[in-house]
UniProtKB/Swiss-Prot annotation:
PANTHER family assigned: 12S RRNA N4-METHYLCYTIDINE METHYLTRANSFERASE, S-ADENOSYL-METHYLTRANSFERASE MRAW
Example of a GO cellular component annotation carried by this entry: cytoplasm
Protein name: Ribosomal RNA small subunit methyltransferase H
Function: Specifically methylates the N4 position of cytidine in position 1402 (C1402) of 16S rRNA.
Compartments reported by the entry: Cytoplasm
Presence of keyword Ligase: no
Top enzyme category: transferase
EC id: 2.1.1.199
Binding residues annotated for S-adenosyl-L-methionine, in chain numbering: A32, G33, H34, D52, F79, D100, Q107
Xref: HAMAP family: 16SrRNA_methyltr_H
Alphabetic keyword roster: Cytoplasm, Methyltransferase, rRNA processing, S-adenosyl-L-methionine, Transferase
GO molecular function: rRNA (cytosine-N4-)-methyltransferase activity
Amino acid sequence: MFEHVTVLKNESVIGLNIKPDGIYVDCTLGGAGHSQEIVKQLTGGGHLYAFDQDQYALSHAKETLSPYRGSFTLIESNFRYMREKLEELGVHHVDGVLFDLGVSSPQLDEDERGFSYHRDAPLDMRMNRSQSLSAYEVVNQWDFIELMKIISRYGEERFAKQIARKIEQSREKKPIRTTGELVDIIKEAIPAPARRTGGHPAKRTFQAIRIAVNDELGAFEEALEAAIDLTAPKGRICVITFHSLEDRICKEMFREASKGPDVPPGLPVIPEEYKATLKLITKKPIVPTAEEIELNNRARSAKLRIAEKQ
C-alpha cells in the first residue's frame, strides 16, 4: 500500500487560490494528497497535470484519483521537463503550479530503494528506477574530490573531507554495496563527540548522495524557471521545501522575479518590461503547526513559499 502523509496540504492548496475552470500542475504527485485536493475543486474546463517519475506512485494515483477521471492527466517524467511535456499536450499557460520537494514516505520506507539510513538495503536512491546512475556508482566510482564536494555542498556536512576519505579507503578493500555498510563507514569517519549530537550521523551524507544521484537541485531550478514562465497573470506558484538548499533556490528566484530590472530614473510611466514578474504572497515561509509535526515528524523541516504572477 502506498501510504504517504501529505505535508502542508491545506495551506498549499489554499495558497494556489484555485479557480474551478483553471489549469493546474502538481510537479510532485507522490501519494496524490495535493493532487486530490486540487482536482476535487475543478469543474468544467478545469484540469490538473501531475508529474512523477515513479511508476508505483503513478499507478497508485490513477486509482486514488479515479473518481475525477477526465479532470486530470498523469505524466511519467521528471518535472524538469515540464515545459516540453505540457507543450506536447498543447498546454502553454497554467493557472498554478505546486512543488512538494520532499521524498515521499513510501520511497523512504521501501527497503529496496536505499533512501533510508535506518535500514540495510542495496545502495540505490534513484527516484527514477530506469536511470543508470545510482548511489552505488556515486559511492564506489566517484573520486575523492567529487565525493567531498557533494557531501559538503549538498549535505552541508562539516566532516565531508573525513567521510570522503573513509569511503575511498573502504572501497579499496571491497565495494560498498549496502546502506548499512555506508552508515558504518560514515560513523567511523565522524569524531565521537560530534556523533552524539545533531541527529543521525549519516543524515547529511545520505541527503547529499540522493541529491547528486537525482540532480535534484538542477532539476528544481529548471522547473521553477519554467513554472514562472508558464504561469498566467494572477496564477500562483507554491513551493514546499525540506532543506535549506532548495529553500535558498526558491527564495532567491522568487525574490529576483519580484524585483524586476532596475528602472531608469525619470520615466513618467514604467514600461512593461521593467515590471516585476512575481508578487510575493509569503514574505516569510509558512511552516507546519505543532499539531501537524506531532502527527507527522517528517513535516518538521517543511517550508512553504507562495508567489503570484503579475
